Design a protein with these regions (language model features):
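Conserved catalytic alpha/beta core of Sir2/sirtuin-type deacylases, generalized to analogous enzyme cores
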Residues: 2-176
């Protein structure tokens, strides 16, 4: 949910965990501090003042602590910043999983690739294997797979997400 699509669709922010980061936040490119910075106003200013695919130098954001450039808060290397908000969301997520350890649950994976499989994909597989009431579902064009151990309780749809959603909408409208 780095792009806030769940929030735009009406989901409560407190029910989301941006484990991979957030396009709406900057962080120090050197991760000198475990702090993130809202970037909407700065990004809008950049858009308004850009010319010939360039922005004015004074709009390049810098860390208020060390003066290094700020960058998007995205998990792409070992410099990813996990701020206080990230840790609060992680705790809410872990609590959600703990309180539903053996309940009926769907681990739904939409478009998760192999950039950082240890963050979402592998834990979903492990939790599905461990919970007899769990189902794993993956929609991913070209990468909808699961391990043999959970194949009997998995749904892997190897197609573009928009096609799958449109098909679901069409079936609902046709009462299928």
């Amino acid at each position: 949910n780095v792009d806030h699509c769940f929030q735009k669709a009406g989901f409560d922010k407190k029910r989301l965990f941006y484990t991979q980061g957030d396009y709406g936040l900057f962080q120090c490119s050197e991760s000198c501090c475990q702090e993130t910075f809202d970037n909407e106003a700065v990004v809008l200013e950049m858009l308004n003042r850009q010319k010939d695919m360039k922005i004015p130098t004074e709009l390049v954001p810098v860390c208020p602590h060390c003066g290094k450039p700020l960058t998007m808060n995205l998990r792409s290397d070992d410099k990813f910043v996990e701020d206080e908000g990230w840790h609060r969301a992680a705790e809410r997520y872990q609590n959600f999983l703990r309180t539903r350890a053996n309940e009926k649950i769907l681990f739904l994976e939409l478009g998760v690739g192999y950039n950082t499989p240890v963050i979402i994909k592998y834990p979903f597989w492990q939790m599905t294997a461990k919970n007899p009431n769990a189902t794993y579902a993956c929609v991913n064009n070209g990468q909808a797979v699961c391990p043999p151990e959970i194949r009997h309780k998995s749904i892997c749809i190897n197609d573009d997400i928009s096609n799958v959603i449109n098909e679901c909408i069409n079936r609902k409208q046709c009462n299928i």
